[in-house]
Amino acid sequence: MKVIEQSQISPPPNSVPSPTILPLTFFDIPWVYCHPIQRIFFYHFPHPTNHFLQTTLPILKHSLSITLQHFFPFSSNLIIPSDSQTEPYIRYLNTDSLSFIVAESSADFNLLISDSQDVQNWHPLVPNLPPPSTEQNNTRVIPIMSIQVTVMPNSGFSICLTFNHVAADGKSLHHFMKFWASVSKNRANNNDLSLDQSLSMPLDLPSHERDRVKDPKGLKHINLQELQGFDSKNLESADLVQDSYVNKIRKTLVLSFEQVQKLKKWVAEKCKDSHGTQHLSTFVVTSSLIWFCMIKSEQIECDHVDDLCNFVFLAECRDTAEQRRTQGGG
């Protein structure tokens, strides 16, 4: 792996008011101290590295800047005041930007996009977030996103994003990626690398009106209380590549309808004597299988068979009657 370029990308000058403050909602608070999320995208590109650097890279960088005008939380920082009575928030200043790394790799592109491979093959493609800094009164300033573009000459390239979940969920991130891709395509087709904003926007713009999220049950206050006493520095310095990933294979498994039915039948047979007949949904049996496989793959040594293991799944709430809006960055 050879790093070709390290730079910072920000929204166009004066395109976002400075400072801009975004309060966190009760949806966001639980993610404040969670490990960063990584998402990687692969693209075929059968050309040498120099061709990529001269043609595609300038378009990607210019279009990213334009995209960040509308998705500015990704170039912002998470602010955690030392005073536990002051809530964390997202802050954008006109000096803020995100880390953008360009690298070249001799890795086999076809292997990287194959279905079954060593999980460590992707690790060199993943950027780390820049280290947090400290402002006056010991306020912690934590970068929200870092991007790495890795070129595999004459075969393809990858774009990997490491980001704090507090700024966006999966739907918001994919909105960001689709928007960036659309602007890039627009710029390439028009052969125009200027930052002129006259071209029409390719997709719907995100909403950052977090004050529209209602919290009648006071969940935000409860979540904030749970954060008190948490040592953020331990997590901030944690290695994104865990030891549990050593000697592991990454593979996508697709369950057919017939296999799901067999699972349901097998579980029903096991449970009929002790629990009687129960309805088993596809979600329940699939989640149970995933849960079991995750625990086995982590090879955690348990002293007791009945040690508690949690399985957490996320749910979309944008279309509920109370929260019919676009959350976070999109």
Question: PLM features: residue spans?
Answer:
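Long, contiguous juxta-domain segments that are non-catalytic but functionally important
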Residues: 1-26
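Soluble acyl-CoA-dependent acyltransferase catalytic core bearing the H(X)4D motif
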Residues: 11-19, 33, 38-73, 77-330
